[in-house]
Amino acid sequence: MRKIMEERSLVFHRKGMPSPGIVARAAILLIWLAPGLAFGQDQTKPLIKLVATGGTIANTLEGRIPIQQTIADIRKNFPETLKLLDSVKLEVIDIIRVGSGSFTSKEFLDIARTVNRVIQEPEVKGVIVTQGTTTTEETAYFLHLLVKSNKPIVVTNSQRRHGTVGNDGDKNFVDAVSVVLSEEAVGKGVLVVHNQTINSGREVLKTSGHPGAFLSGMHGVLGIIEADGVSFYRAPTRRHTSNSEFDINTITTLPKVEVISAYYDADPGLIQAAVDLGVQGIVLNGLTASGGPHRAQQPLLERLAEEGMPIVRTARGGMNNRVTVNPQDKFIAGDNLLAHKARILLQLALTKTSDLKEIQRMFNQY
């Protein structure tokens, strides 16, 4: 119990944190929560672990607030949510309070380890991760590849600050609870819930700073959340979560992989600079539709591939574009993954092997 309270208290001791007034209100809220360390004390209710990492969903115009305050305000301001929220136990684990645009591999690994640990607890129904929108799609895909469970795991967020006009975070959080409770969410991998839609962690992309900006390209959403409940219309077909060969328990650091873009007048010196920095692999955000490099980049990339460095071709046209294997070169085809997601998969692949054929197999399967 002490450990959990210490985890929650971390949020109040980081540099640049809330104003004294916000801290005081949060302290009162924590005292209210302390007896049971959860919203809802009935042991027969489904238990949802909430892994909180900050983000706009836990920010107001006055500054940062704990996610517990966000939930308390939802309960107070929207009594129609009480039936749902009172039907579950919510336990909060505050692990990070950093803007998601500042996340490093350490934060990603910490989140993955935490989610993987708590999801294994037999009494846990599922996990909700709240974070900033900036890297939601990367967090979701990272967890999608690493967490070993069929239980529902939902990442949600907010584009507008809590308590402001048009705030979307309150609805997103309530919808996330509904999705975790849905039996249809079991075995679907890591899901991103935003603007009443359910997206796969593999495909979702933030397209703007507006509510409703999380989309999945031509593939479409997995499902939707409406007044009468949660509805799924398709399921991921690529390997993920419990069917993944990647194991967070064996990974302490991530290999260095950089993304290089193709464009006119592209200078191959940038590729050489990445090599000089010690990269173990390169993802090319290449030309649509081939995912190929600019002509000036081609010789150096081909030489690196011949020497055994994995060079993954992706297309800057986005997920509506599929890059296929070219038997004439040794580049790895990134399929329809966006460059920054291909980077995640390549990093994890390199924790297992440096064999180019094996890495291509992984890109074919994930």
What label would you give each PLM region?
Residues 1-22:
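N-terminal secretory signal peptides that target proteins for export/translocation
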Residues 129-151, 294-301:
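Short Gly/Thr/Asp-enriched flexible loops that form oxyanion-binding sites at enzyme active sites
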Residues 41-118:
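ATP/NTP phosphate-donor binding region
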Residues 155-227:
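Internal gly/pro-rich beta-alpha loop/helix module
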Residues 45, 51-52, 58, 74, ...:
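Accessory alpha-helical/coil subdomains and C-terminal extensions
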Residues 121-136, 277-290:
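Short acidic, glycine-rich surface-loop motifs adjacent to enzyme active sites
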Residues 25-36:
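Bacterial N-terminal signal peptides
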Residues 289-366:
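C-terminal non-catalytic interaction/assembly regions of soluble proteins
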